[in-house]
Amino acid sequence: MSHLIDISIDDSALPPPTPEIEQERKVAIFDLLEDNSFKLPAREDRDVPPGPFSLTLAIRERRLVFDVTGPEGAQVAEFHLSLGPFRQVVKDYWQICESYFDAVKKLPPSQIEAIDMARRGIHNEGARILLERLDGKAEVDIDTSRRLFTLICVLHFGA
């Protein structure tokens, strides 16, 4: 399966990220580039290059935009996803992350582990929603979907 070799964030329409959000973005991009699978499905009306691809993520008009370019830099796909299906899971994810960061400072390991398990469960739900929303637009594995969901969370935070 093909993969992503470059990921960028177009946040020109968003408020400037906080230093913490900027750091989360950098970590999410690094993790995604370390290991991912990304393929465009075949279409009758166009040839689909095998990749590798570059991806720019943006939020425009309250929609998540995937702008995909091929190895030569030419756009090979652009698709828009409604943010609606992500809103609650992103909100839940940020709330549980805040609880986790607070817990690390003052709770025993057993309670931290319980919060972390809940965080992973919400993260998995977000990845599943993303897989469903990408159906017919891009083919990714569950690990790539998880990493993309993390990036969507930090992008969505500024929207």
UniProtKB/Swiss-Prot annotation:
Disulfide connectivity for this sequence is none
**Which superkingdom does the taxonomy of this entry point to?**
Bacteria
Q: Which InterPro entries match?
A: UCP032146 (IPR008321)
The record's annotation in HAMAP family points to: UPF0262
Similarity annotation: Belongs to the UPF0262 family.
Q: What is this protein called?
A: UPF0262 protein Dshi_0980
Q: Which species is this UniProt entry from? A: Dinoroseobacter shibae (strain DSM 16493 / NCIMB 14021 / DFL 12)
